[in-house]
Amino acid sequence: QADTIVILTECQFEKNGYQNRFNHENKWYTMRINQSLRPIKDKLYLEPIEDWRKITTAFPKLDRLNVSIQPRLDAMNSSIIRSAAQILGIRTEIQYDFPTKLTSTARLVEICKHHNATHYLSGISGRNYMDLKLFEDAQIDVVFQDENTLSKKSLIQIL
């Protein structure tokens, strides 16, 4: 459980990641996006209305999300996250990150400090790339969550 969820927008878009697509029953569903190398906050969808219509046609339950179709990746994802949280009764505060020259783990530590965090929740793979000493020096405990032990239900199945 978290007190605050911070949506990262001031970081690099991850090609072939989950920021603009999802996998359901071994099939990928994608919101097409411009291919420029820009931060997430500057990424634009090519055809957001058309792509969202295709997804909601395949998964009518997603109509419950009451999503505001947005041209920017960060705004659209924020709309989906906030709507899903409301439907699921999740009342955790949702914030955006902020511009900083820091990168990688130093950025995460700075965000945690900004929110007076005592703990940082990470996926288990964070062990492979985070500099845990930076968290230790800031007196922030890192809690690794093994995704394999979490529910495998997708948002579509939960709705």
Where is each model-derived feature located?
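Residues lining hydrophobic/aromatic ligand-binding pockets adjacent to catalytic sites
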Residues: Q1-L159
